[in-house]
Design a protein with these regions (language model features):
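Secreted/processed peptides and extracellular or luminal domains of membrane proteins
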Residues: 41, 58-59, 95, 107, ...
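N-terminal secretory signal peptides
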Residues: 41-91
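C-terminal motif of bacterial Sec signal peptides marking the signal peptidase cleavage site
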Residues: 30-34
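Extracytosolic low-complexity repeat regions of secreted or lipid-anchored proteins
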Residues: 100-170
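Bacterial N-terminal signal peptides that target proteins for export
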Residues: 6-23
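Short, charged/polar surface micro-motifs in flexible loops or helix N-caps
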Residues: 91-98
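Bacterial signal peptide processing site
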Residues: 36-39
Length: 170
């Protein structure tokens, strides 16, 4: 006597439902785990400039120990949660200033410190300009500028900072 076991339709239906629930649960867990909070950053006036897009696509995923996360506006980026570094492309290019200007990897940055110690570093001589805001007590400006200068250099330089020594000769 031979016995043939046929799977019951109810059993297959239960297995299918269980598999669907397991797959859906795994998908949701993975999706939620990989979601970083969105940083609210206002877009700069010239954020739609095509030169910003060329720079934005080559921004690094990490600065120091801070990972890049999504932002709420075009041509913006943020690293860290809470944000340690915030970048906006399309800000107004700075004119002549007495604020210090540093050159990092052939990109000039004008540095401005506010009363609370937060620094705003803006590319000089590039249009559109790129603005980076950071707290140097949380992440070193040297790390930030060294990491971002390659991306910022995608917007061609039209001017350079003038050193104090060169300015005194005029």
């Amino acid at each position: 006597m031979s016995l043939t076991l046929e799977p019951s339709p109810n059993r297959n239906l239960k297995i299918g439902r269980i598999a669907s629930v397991v797959l859906l649960g795994g998908f949701l867990a993975t999706s939620l785990a990989s979601c970083a909070s969105v940083a609210s950053v206002d877009a700069a006036p010239d954020a739609a400039n095509p030169a910003c897009a060329e720079m934005m696509v080559v921004l690094p995923e990490v600065i120091g120990d801070a990972e890049r996360r999504p932002t709420s506006s075009q041509a913006t980026s943020a690293w860290g949660d809470p944000s340690q570094v915030v970048l906006r492309c399309g800000v107004e290019a700075p004119g002549p200033t007495t604020d210090p200007c540093v050159s990092v990897n052939n990109v000039d940055w004008v540095a401005h410190e506010d009363k609370s110690g937060i620094w705003t570093l803006t590319t000089y001589g590039r249009t559109p300009a790129t603005e980076v805001v950071l707290d140097p007590n949380v992440i070193p400006s040297s790390t930030v500028l060294a990491t971002l200068s390659d991306s910022a250099s995608r917007i061609p330089a039209q001017k350079q900072c003038t050193s104090v020594e060169k300015a005194e000769k005029f």
